[in-house]
């Protein structure tokens, strides 16, 4: 597969890695298979990335930058607590649905047998998302003078667990059960429960 000189080789390698994660669910990706997919030698891969772990770090960097930059936009543009929570969870679910291979990284499935540092990086991304959810829920008390009957940290953890569960179902179903399926109806129920608390 010839790559146009205009395409950044590093980006092309990462795109191929994400595609392979999508098209080979449950399988481990070797550098030999990746090199064949990219159309270069393994040595050429290592000219752009010193290790396979660095390739996964490149995907994790993309995940973090994509999600957190959009979360910051939600935080800036939307002031309603429930709408912020909904948009943040939808962002995570839509991002996963549009990037099935990357969902395997988020879920940890693609990182089995890889460097522990990679799983820690993904955990850190989820911790940052949970922190944003806590902040959103705590700001409701400050803005409206009325909070929730349950600690905001517990609620934030529950909301994130719902999204993570949907991503896990998506990966487990080999990308057939979409993370966004029924989310709108589920959110109505979740919101009612949150507002009653």
Swiss-Prot record:
Residue ranges constituting the HTH tetR-type domain according to the UniProt record: 7-67
DNA-binding region positions on the chain: 30-49
Localization per record: Cytoplasm, Nucleoid
GO MF entry, a single one: sequence-specific DNA binding
Gene Ontology CC terms, in alphabetical order: bacterial nucleoid; cytoplasm
Signal sequence coordinates: none
Pfam families: SlmA-like_C, TetR_N
Main location: cytoplasm
InterPro entries found in the cross-reference section: Homeodomain-like_sf, HTH-type_Tx_Regulator, HTH_TetR, NO_SlmA, SlmA-like_C
GO BP of this protein: cell division; negative regulation of division septum assembly
Keywords: Cell cycle, Cell division, Cytoplasm, DNA-binding
Function field: Required for nucleoid occlusion (NO) phenomenon, which prevents Z-ring formation and cell division over the nucleoid. Acts as a DNA-associated cell division inhibitor that binds simultaneously chromosomal DNA and FtsZ, and disrupts the assembly of FtsZ polymers. SlmA-DNA-binding sequences (SBS) are dispersed on non-Ter regions of the chromosome, preventing FtsZ polymerization at these regions.
Database matches in NCBIfam families: PRK09480.1
PANTHER family per record: ACREF/ENVCD OPERON REPRESSOR-RELATED, ACREF_ENVCD OPERON REPRESSOR-RELATED
Subunit (UniProt): Homodimer. Interacts with FtsZ.
Family, as annotated: Belongs to the nucleoid occlusion factor SlmA family.
Protein name as catalogued: Nucleoid occlusion factor SlmA
UniProt organism field: Shewanella sediminis (strain HAW-EB3)
Encoding gene (name): slmA
